[in-house]
Amino acid sequence: AVESKFAPSRPDPQATKRVAFTVAVIALSAKMAKADGIVTRDEIAAFRARVHIPPSEVKQVGRFWDLARQTPDGFEDYAKQVARLFVPRAPVLEQLLDLLFHIAKSDGDITSPELSYLTTVAGIFGFDEADFDRLLALHQSNGPSPYEILGVSSDIDDQALRKHWKHLARTHHPDTLTADGMPEEFIAAANNRLAKINAAYDVITRQRGL
């Protein structure tokens, strides 16, 4: 089983947490790809681009992915499994939701079944409608504004902007997320999100002449 493959010989609470998270993320990602009825190569590639799987575990992960992608049914249970590991709206949960959005849009516009899937997962994770709309804006085909990426209004003052950016950069830093239980396999996804946050802040500061 995937659980035994990932689990260390003497699991500690943090290691057990990382195993549970990894298994649930693979299942949620596979079922996300199946949400609109068809799993495309683009969706599989999107998962592999954001999640680093060690060569020794590729076959095991592949078998579990193939099993999970047979049907989107049961995704709520995996979402609840992840949600129990963290406080509501935790940065790690936002990273996971961002990954699911990335998979959903990888083969074109986000479809209605995919949107329903994402909405349900977001609710289980504790995110409200405003949170969801902010994350959705990041994945629209026309691209988000730098303010949408940071989750602030365009009239925010310079001092508050800098404070908010520093908070985001700290909470979404891979080291912070790893300490909170995110497995190292997902560092690539975390780095991608952090790069977007920093790039958005750079754009705004240049626009404002800061």
Model-derived segments and their meaning:
Residues 1-34, 38-210:
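Small-residue-enriched hydrophobic alpha-helices in membranes
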